Amino acid sequence: MKIPSFIRGNLLLKMTSLNAVVVSIRLLISAVVQRLLYDYVGAVGLYKIGQLRSLSQLLMSISSLGSFSGIVKYVAEYKTDKEQLQKLFSTTFVFTVVGVLASGILLFFFSGQLSQYLFATENFSYLIKLTAVVIPFIAIQRIFNGVIHGLSDYKKFAKIDLVSYLLSVTLTLILLFQYNLDGVLIAIALTPIIQVLILLYFFFKTLREYIIFKDLKFKSPMAKGLLAFTAMSFVTSILLPLVEIDIRSMLEEKMSGKDAGVWTNITFISKNYMVFSGSLFTLYVLPKFAGIYSAHNFKKEVLTIYKTILPLFATGMLLVYFFRHLIIELLYPGLTEMAPLFKWQLIGDFIRLASLVLLNQFLAKKLVRSFIFSELFSLVLFYVLAQILVVPYGVEGVVIAHLIRYIFYFFIVAFLVFRYFKKKED
């Protein structure tokens, strides 16, 4: 099939088009899997699955000490400088050893307490110990993905992402039919192993060009540069999952496990279509912003990104809204209380998308204080509003808090980004 010329000449459109195909396939498969999960484990089971996924998200950052965005930035900048790359990966090696040992020991020896915190029972302590054993694979997958994104190798990333997803879904379904909820949780814990194996199969030859494994040293010459990204990652990749875990626990305590499952379901739908933007940011936006130094060029690039992806997202979100009852019936039959949540979640996610485009400037230019301030403000506002609004509005109050959070967030991020350029020009 011939690619239209207007797409061929625009890298962002090419990435968007390929990404759309991969995400569409994932969404279709995910819909089937989600329905099966709902039928087998119910809303309460989905709440527990959400808790483990949040823990996995948290470990992706802790295990590599939050160096992912730093790897993307520095690989994009130094892809032709072997000496700098070796310094980068030696530092990353040190960070990973520290992160893996610290998080692995914590999970293994406090598995009972963590199981109680996440699932309100110590029955899943075996699962926490299994996750502790898998942590090295979580770290390796995160680092190698950073290299792919830094090289903007979007075709290879799409292939790796899709094959990994298909295999992890297959494992999930096999274990679901064999062991029900426990099987699904074990499959989620084991997924990083599959991801690393697929990544090495498709990408090892390229990795060897940029990482000379035998020359890696237990030294950290770029620690100062990467620690800035560690600080930024701490807020988004560690505090965010903790907030999500706490809100689910709060919903279960104040309302019911089913209500916690309802919120988990709406956020699951949201995360599935927001996956579309995540890879675009790290494959295109972050490397692009890293090479832009003037306000004029930045505004021009932001407008190009907005004109390319916002109309696509708006169309997709409108379709999700208008077909929300069908989506609920297909994925979560009988869970009609989800319907009022869609409008708040979708509008909030659209504003979030526009904000995240601008936020990548903080990562590209290592604007640590601006990044941490905006993220902390966003998380604290969301957490406080969720606690307040859940009393009069129930689960809907949490999703309303999500929308209010991102309205404030957009204006704060926009103000800080353009203040940066104004100071630079002065």
Predicted region positions:
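Transmembrane helix-bundle signature of multi-pass secondary active exporters and lipid flippases
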Residues: 49, 53-63, 236, 240, ...
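Membrane-water interface segments that mark the loop-to-transmembrane alpha-helix transition
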Residues: 14-26, 52, 57, 61-112, ...
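Helix-loop junctions and terminal segments of transmembrane helices
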Residues: 34-35, 64-80, 150, 266, ...
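Interfacial segments at transmembrane-helix termini and the short loops linking adjacent helices
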Residues: 111-131, 258, 322-350, 396
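Interhelical loop/hinge segments that connect adjacent transmembrane helices in multipass membrane
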Residues: 1-12, 188, 199-244, 292-297, ...
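Membrane-interface junctions at transmembrane-helix termini in multi-pass inner-membrane proteins
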Residues: 136-160, 347-374
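Hydrophobic alpha-helical transmembrane segments
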Residues: 125, 129, 159-207, 377-381, ...
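Signature of the first transmembrane helix
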Residues: 10-69, 104, 108, 169, ...
